[in-house]
Amino acid sequence: KIAEIMEDENMQNSMNHPMIQDQIINGLDVDELPDGVGDFGHAAENPIPVNGALGELLYLSLLKTKDTNLRLLFHRLGSVESLDMYETVSIDGRKWDILFLSMYHPRKSKKTPNGYDLADYRSQPLLYGTNQRVKNFPYGLQSAIQETTEKMIGIPLPPPQVREAEESVRFHRPPEHEDRIKIATQHVQGLIS
């Protein structure tokens, strides 16, 4: 059943509240928003179109770094209207990033932000992050994923790779990344002012 949920976007869409489901189904069916401005996925004005909260998690779980082929760990920093801002880090702790997603679309984009590729979901059909904010990200991510998967699909499924990374990798947010988070947060908040 989990593989079916990972693959079937209609099933994913049907798992949403009816009001949200309607917005998703009636959203633009595109890989990139036609009025997007800036670097795809990296600019708040050019977010990645996905199908709902589960679509965000599935899309981000399939992203891998182009240069090292590593999956990303992620959590949601916040949201404004239909725009969600996620912090990501490669599972080896070397590549930190911020990505923007727009969740009211009938399917997930097949396009990737610069520096990333999409993995085949069949290779590891697991979620590598959460739509919650994790205070000491990525430490504590495993339990947040467990809560998220139990809530969304009824089964707590934290990937063992997340636990292994939490135990063996020394994650340290670079100061310039911390600055980017502050700037991006202020920018996103300014979009609705």
Feature map (PLM): residue ranges:
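N-terminal secretory-pathway/extracellular module detecting exported/lumenal segments
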Residues: 2-83, 90-193
